[in-house]
Amino acid sequence: QFLALTSRPDDHELLAVMLDIPKRIVKRLSLLQIHELANLFDFIKRDQKVSSFSLTTLRIPSAGILHSPNPKLQEMPFMQFVYVDTFYMSYAVDPRFETLCKLVSYLYSPKTGFNKITADANIDKIRKLDKKTLEAISLNYGLIRKWITERYPLVFPKHSNTRKSHDSSWLDVFDNIVGDDLKDRDKYAEVPVNAVFRFITKKIKEGRK
């Protein structure tokens, strides 16, 4: 039923709205990707949200096996999220293949964890993967991002103009957390993103009292 629904051109817009991505990206989906999304969208019937990656590992030539973030982005370093989310929002506005490769390279890490130098080094290797696989990963992240925004509504207000100032706003958040403690800047960058979101939520609530 889902396949029949999303295969109609008129429903591209509906799927784009549900995923919060441009309709032109949805139109490029293959039937296989639609099928995978049907599995992901099974949460509609269960009234649940997608909070984990379907593709948990990527085998990259000369780079080994890379791993997706944990479900609910648990233990994902805040700075990794800043990079990933910035690339994702940029790709949603201007879907360049280079941006897509950066998104996936920063999203998937070795077993040892995220490292910016490693992520940058893997971009060229990610380029060799099938573009449809990379786009499916981007779509999956979009679903997880939707789950995150609903979990932390004060951090992600629905009517904010996030597309225009998204990258700078995350850097502002990071700078506010670090404050004058510049010597420990790297330590703050490693704080789990969910802990940062809880901290921001707490501060917003305190500011409203």
Residue ranges: model-predicted function:
Residues 1-209:
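An amphipathic, hydrophobic-aromatic interaction surface with interspersed Lys/Arg
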